[in-house]
């Protein structure tokens, strides 16, 4: 009997979409023979899922869910935009987002292997495989994320282009600033900043940008070169750092200015401390 290794189990799961436990059982029954294990899974009624698992999933939708303690963000992919618009697909996305919010899994792999709360005889991944059979396309849960609520944090979530882009902003200092956080989330959907602030940029990126700037300047005195480079780096910050960007609804304000204005109004020290921008397929 060939050894049933974790790598073999993972390969069978990737080829079939069947849960890890069932893959292990199938391989053990087949004495480690991959093709026989696949054949046995087909005989067990999972043939359609097996046939579709290898297809590329380029389309998809990002969904969110929340409860009193947790916010969940989930991306689910399919083969065609036609299926993404299907109500059955949307229901699956909602169910998965709700499951993530309610169970707060440690990782995507752990989530796929845990029991599905609505049908405890299935793992989440087995539930996904049933949807593949029902809809007739390869469907994959690509990524998940959870965020924990607290008395001193506000979250704003914005969905753009029917869930093709979803953004989230976290503001610390109050749990009553959802409207401000959502406004900034809308801004992020349009401007796609790479970093929260200059302090969050890796040093190698800054060094590279300085080298590029210096390479664009020829024959200038050293003190002039330094000033020009400093100006170019500041322009890089203004373009790529959220807190330095001009607010899309009022370009007389930076995002920092916008938050500071609100801080004065509510009498609390507010700050943007985190943001997320998910784009389907990225």
From Swiss-Prot:
Say where the protein is mainly found: cytoplasm
Give the GO cellular component terms, alphabetically: cytoplasm
Annotated InterPro entries: EF-Ts_dimer_sf, Transl_elong_EFTs/EF1B, Transl_elong_EFTs/EF1B_dimer, Transl_elong_Ts_CS, UBA-like_sf
Q: Where are the transmembrane segments?
A: none
User: SUPFAM superfamilies, from UniProt?
Assistant: Elongation factor Ts (EF-Ts), dimerisation domain, UBA-like
HAMAP family from the entry? EF_Ts (MF_00050)
Q: Which NCBIfam families match?
A: tsf
The record's similarity note reads:
Belongs to the EF-Ts family.
Identify this protein by name: Elongation factor Ts
Species this protein is from: Protochlamydia amoebophila (strain UWE25)
Give the organism's phylogenetic lineage.
Bacteria, Pseudomonadati, Chlamydiota, Chlamydiia, Parachlamydiales
The protein's gene is named tsf
């Amino acid at each position: 009997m060939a050894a049933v290794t974790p790598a073999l189990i993972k390969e069978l799961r990737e080829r079939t979409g069947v849960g890890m436990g069932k893959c292990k059982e199938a391989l053990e029954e087949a004495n480690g023979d991959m093709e026989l294990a696949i054949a046995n899974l087909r005989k067990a009624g999972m043939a359609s899922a097996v046939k579709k698992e290898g297809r590329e999933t380029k389309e998809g939708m990002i969904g969110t869910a929340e409860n009193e303690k947790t916010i969940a963000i989930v991306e689910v992919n399919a083969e065609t935009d036609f299926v993404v618009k299907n109500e059955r697909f949307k229901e699956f996305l909602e169910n998965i987002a709700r499951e993530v919010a309610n169970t707060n899994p440690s990782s995507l792999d752990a989530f796929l292997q845990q029991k599905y709360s609505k049908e405890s005889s299935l793992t989440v991944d087995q539930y996904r495989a049933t949807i593949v059979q029902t809809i007739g396309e390869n469907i994959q849960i690509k990524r998940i994320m959870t965020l924990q609520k607290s008395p001193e944090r506000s979250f704003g979530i914005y969905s753009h282009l029917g869930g093709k882009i979803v953004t989230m902003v976290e503001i610390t200092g109050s749990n009553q600033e959802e409207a401000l956080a959502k406004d900034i989330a809308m801004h992020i959907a349009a401007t796609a900043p790479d970093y929260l602030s200059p302090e969050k940029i890796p040093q190698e990126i800054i060094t590279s940008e300085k080298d590029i700037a210096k390479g664009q300047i020829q024959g200038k005195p050293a003190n002039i070169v330094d000033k020009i480079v400093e100006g170019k780096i500041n322009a890089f910050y203004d373009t790529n750092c959220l807190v330095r960007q001009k607010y899309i609804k009022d370009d007389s304000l930076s995002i920092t200015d916008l938050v500071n204005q609100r801080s004065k109004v509510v009498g609390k020290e507010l700050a943007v401390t985190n943001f997320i921008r998910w784009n389907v397929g990225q």
